[in-house]
Design a protein with these regions (language model features):
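Mature, structured domains enriched in cysteine- and short glycine motifs
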Residues: 1-213
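Glycine-biased, low-complexity coil/linker segments
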Residues: 220-223
Length: 225
């Protein structure tokens, strides 16, 4: 039976059999039987890690160990509020720091601690009292590559890629639409959106990069807006 540890762009955790390409950590959220409690984080240091690193192996949801979470890809991890791990994804983390400094107008040589980034992100990704995701409003064409948005009806999650958007599922991206000028609900935290604007390009699942998504509108047909 699948465990409830697959993360959506809305930051929620679901039990599905689809595999992810990144693993996440928010602390210990499960009991000794591997069942999630009510907590959805235990600390503000939310990271996204490689699935394999230096031959290390760990049982999933082991007793008294952090809860392994899984994301379809990096864009989903960012939408849920997770930054690159500074150990197993060192190069991605360094690129992230460069873009974070640029987005905030900081000197390239300025000292930047992961704890400072995590503190800033935690204020933007979730309401601590209600545990609901914090979202923004923006015009769709103004958003950079890799930003997740919610589109009605149904409030499906879509990711921006150049002039199109792709619909997310746990298994991959299954549909594309041309981008139109329309106000949307942005799921990706504000600071992450600015990091994307500053040049960090998140890696998407092969279903997007290989062009596996199929168009929901014929060429020249009506898209959003």
């Amino acid at each position: 039976m699948p465990r409830q540890n697959r993360v959506t762009p809305f930051g929620t955790l679901e039990a599905v059999s689809a595999r992810g390409t990144l693993m996440g950590n928010r602390g210990i959220m499960h009991d000794v039987n591997g069942v999630l409690g009510t907590a959805r984080w235990q600390h503000p240091h939310w990271i996204a890690c490689r699935l394999a690193f230096k031959g290390r192996w760990r049982p999933i949801m082991a007793a008294r160990s952090w809860t392994e979470l899984f994301f379809l890809d990096e864009a989903v991890a960012f939408a849920a509020g997770h930054r690159p791990c500074a150990e197993c994804r060192r190069e991605d983390y360094r690129r992230f720091l460069v873009a974070w400094r640029a987005a905030r107008g900081l000197p390239a040589s300025s000292k930047l601690l992961a704890t400072d980034i995590d503190r800033a992100l935690h204020k933007e990704r979730v309401e601590s009292r209600t545990r609901t995701q914090i979202t923004l409003k923006a015009n769709l064409p103004d958003l950079p590559y890799g930003t997740f948005v919610a589109i009605p009806p149904g409030r499906d999650a879509w990711v921006t890629i150049e002039t199109d958007i792709l619909r997310w599922t746990h298994a991959g991206y299954d549909r594309s639409r041309p981008m139109h000028a329309v106000d949307v609900e942005v799921l990706t935290p504000r600071s992450i959106v600015e990091v994307f604007r500053a040049g960090y390009r998140p890696k998407l699942h092969p279903s997007a990069e290989a062009g596996a998504a199929t168009s929901s509108h014929p060429k020249g047909g009506r898209g959003l807006g």
